[in-house]
Structure formats: C-alpha cells, structure tokens
Amino acid sequence: PNPEYTMFGRTYALGYEPDLDDTLILRPIRRVLDPKLAWVVWYPLRRAGSFEQLAPKEQTTILMEHGGVGRAYGSAGYVHDVRLACHGLEKNDNDFLIGLLGPELFPLSSCVQRMRRTRQTSIHLERLGPFFAGRVAWQSAPPTP
C-alpha cells in the first residue's frame, strides 16, 4: 500500500436521520456490496476555512444546494454515495472521503462535474482529490439478515 493514498474515515449522521443503524452501518454496507453498483469514484476533500466562518444558516443554504444535486442523481438511480468523515484521522488532514457508486461510470463523473458548479465546491473547498475511479474488481456477498 502507498501511504500517500491511504484514506480512513467514519460514517456520520446529520441529526435528522430516523434510523441511525441504517445510516451509520447498514446503508454503507448495502451500497458497497451491491453488485449493481459496479462503478466507483472515491476522493477526499478538505473544506476551506471560509466555510467554517459562515453563519450556520448560510452553511445550511450552501449544503442544501450541493446536496440537492446529489439527491437528484440518487433519486434517478444514477449515483449512490458513501460519505466518511475523516477529521483528524488520516495523514493528509482531509475532512471527508466520498465514494460515489453507480451502475455506469458516466453519471458518476457527470455528478462530480455538476457539483463543481455549486458554491460549496467552487468557493469553499481547499482541496479536492486525488480521484480513484474504476470498475469494482471484487465484492463480498452481502451479509444475510
């Protein structure tokens, strides 16, 4: 393994999720083990300090715009995500590790392209990437309930 590309994070909740077991444990497992989601793009990101200085209401507005793009791709079945928080957990001091998973590669790239036009990405990110994209080489069988 190359230490420069070793990334580590933890699942997290935003506070409005009705089922924390699903949000924090079961949904990420379902997504990474779903054989229909054969294409992936993984990348780290670090927010700029400018975002942290915004009022909470402004942060929410910016994140709703950004999240709306992801929800549109997700509700159409094109992109599903796994989001990991990695504040203080890895060498490069990133804030998040994002995994985009889908049945085809093009929508994953299209989603990243579209999100770059949001205020969150275009103004309030210090660092984005490197990107790791490809077809899943192997998946374990999903756990049985």
Role assignments for model-derived ranges:
Residues 1-72, 103-106, 138-145:
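Short S/T/G/P-rich N-terminal loop/turn motif that feeds into the first structured element of a domain
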Residues 26-27, 74-85:
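Short amphipathic beta-strand starts and helix->beta connectors
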Residues 40-46, 85, 90-115:
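Short, well-ordered beta-strand segments in beta-rich or mixed alpha/beta enzyme
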Residues 50-55, 95, 110-112, 118, ...:
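Generic marker of "main functional regions" within proteins
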Residues 64, 87, 119, 129-136:
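Short, surface-exposed, charged/polar-biased interaction segments
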Residues 95, 101, 131-141:
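Short terminal or interdomain "cap/linker" segment that borders an active site or interface and mediates
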